[in-house]
Design a protein with these regions (language model features):
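Post-DEXD/H (motif II) to motif III coupling segment of the RecA-like Helicase ATP-binding lobe
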Residues: 3-65
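Conserved Walker B
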Residues: 1-3, 123, 171, 183
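A short beta-strand-to-loop transition that corresponds to the Sensor-1 phosphate-sensing loop
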Residues: 25-29, 119, 168-170, 186
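Conserved interdomain linker/interface between the two RecA-like ATPase lobes of SF2 helicase motors
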Residues: 44-117
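SF2 helicase motor core recognition
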Residues: 57, 165-183
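Conserved helicase ATPase core of P-loop NTP-dependent helicases/translocases
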Residues: 114, 123-172
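Short hydrophobic/charged patches on amphipathic alpha-helices used for structural packing
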Residues: 11, 101, 105, 151-154, ...
Length: 186
């Protein structure tokens, strides 16, 4: 996840260890703030574009669909650094948890699904709404969830005992769940 190396905090660490050899590896070479990896690292040793990784079998083909929710208007939210502010987005999306849950359950069917929410409160309201639309096991976790509990939830998901895994910013990087076949970005 070397794309984080361009952050102010990481730059201080790299400057402190100025003579150290640093190898950076990331699947996210472009940052929303426009800072390129070439500003942190001397050279790119290897680049493997998505267009090559898919046919080579390293990435699955994906299908992206959008399902507008009646009455939901995101235009009232102002973007910061290219993204909608999580707090305002989470608050707004929590109001639409029920219709969103209906869409997720309808579209996911019986597929193992990971749901990404904007905030902790949003994740918990979305999980509660999902439970009203499905008899399948739905679990939610956030940064405040005990690590052992999170580990157990993930193990249960990978074993097929949890159908929907709802989270707020914890399974975004370095997370591997090959059985997941549906992702909902809410």
């Amino acid at each position: 996840e070397c794309h984080h190396a361009a952050s102010d905090e990481m730059m201080k660490v790299l400057e402190y260890f100025i003579h150290a050899f640093v190898l950076g590896v990331t699947a996210t070479p472009k940052r929303l703030d426009g800072i390129g990896m070439e500003e942190v690292f001397e050279a790119v040793a290897f680049h493997y574009p998505i267009e090559e990784a898919r046919p080579d079998g390293w990435l699955l083909d994906s299908r992206v669909t959008e399902h507008p929710i009646e009455g939901l208007d995101l235009s009232q939210l102002r973007k910061r650094a290219g993204d909608l502010p999580p707090e305002a987005l989470g608050e707004l999306m929590a109001e639409y948890s029920m219709p969103v849950a209906a869409n997720i359950v309808r579209l996911a069917g019986d597929r193992p699904t990971i749901v990404f929410c904007a905030t902790v409160a949003h994740a918990h309201s979305q999980a509660a709404a999902l439970r009203r639309y499905t008899d399948a096991r739905v679990e939610v976790a956030d940064g405040g969830t005990d690590k052992g509990v999170r580990r157990d939830i993930v193990a249960e998901f990978k074993a097929g005992n949890v159908r929907m895994l709802v989270n707020a910013m914890i399974w975004t990087e370095g997370f591997d769940a090959p059985n997941a076949s549906c992702i909902a970005l809410v």
